[in-house]
């Protein structure tokens, strides 16, 4: 039984490693290949790489700098430690891998963004609208430890309707640019891992979640 639990934990670490690997490769490529705000179409106008940076949580929520940024980074680190502790505890109880898989996705996503926050300010020069960032610049990075910006790039404006073409829609549907866009948020692979992990747990592991009550 212990061997089964160890196998589940090992596969959870494999999931975390693969998510982190893809997330960081994509972020480093974007950071060293694109200027801030640059857009690269991938699938027509439905899927684009659009490079932005933010201080906040998934999808750019709760953005901010200074103390808020530091507090958010520390909170992420504490949350990751807690998630790893949960993974180890559950694996020792021979919890089914489906549960471990969902938690591993969430853990990997949280780790992907904390890597940006902790290290990117030290190892990259600043990205601007006219200049591509350099990895390990001679003059040092653009910010201190725990103050790096999170790199976002995945953009899916599947529906893009101008206000004049949808006058029947209420005004609050339209952004400052006068367009109703779905899906407007720009995010990264780590954000996607967190979101998929949460929905996976709610949809496919709800019976296990009920046992926590």
Residue map of PLM features:
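Alpha-helical transmembrane bundles and membrane-interface segments of multipass inner-membrane proteins
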Residues: 1-213
